[in-house]
Amino acid sequence: MFVKTGDKVKVIAGKDKGKEGTVLSVNVKKNRVVVKGVNKIKKHQKPSQTNANGGVVESEGSIHASNVKVISKKEDK
């Protein structure tokens, strides 16, 4: 896949078109990537022992790899 974790990318299609961020994770089998600050989804959490209050948790969802363009590669040491 042309995108690796840590690369800086720009979204070229979809509702978040024009936004930039770094790649947090890559799913090669499904050809999807998770970009920091892009495609925010809200998940309703039920109260549990670890999270007593519950509530709404916001996190990044995945987007298809064809909808992003690499701006700069992660520098390898």
Curated annotation (Swiss-Prot):
Residues 42-61 are annotated as: Disordered. One of its GO terms (cellular component) is ribosome. GO terms for biological process: translation. SMART domains: KOW. GO terms for molecular function: rRNA binding; structural constituent of ribosome. SUPFAM superfamilies: Translation proteins SH3-like domain. Keywords: Ribonucleoprotein, Ribosomal protein, RNA-binding, rRNA-binding. It holds the Pfam family KOW. It comes from the Bacteria. One of two assembly initiator proteins, it binds directly to the 5'-end of the 23S rRNA, where it nucleates assembly of the 50S subunit. One of the proteins that surrounds the polypeptide exit tunnel on the outside of the subunit. Belongs to the universal ribosomal protein uL24 family. Part of the 50S ribosomal subunit. This is Large ribosomal subunit protein uL24. It comes from Lactobacillus acidophilus (strain ATCC 700396 / NCK56 / N2 / NCFM). The gene is rplX.
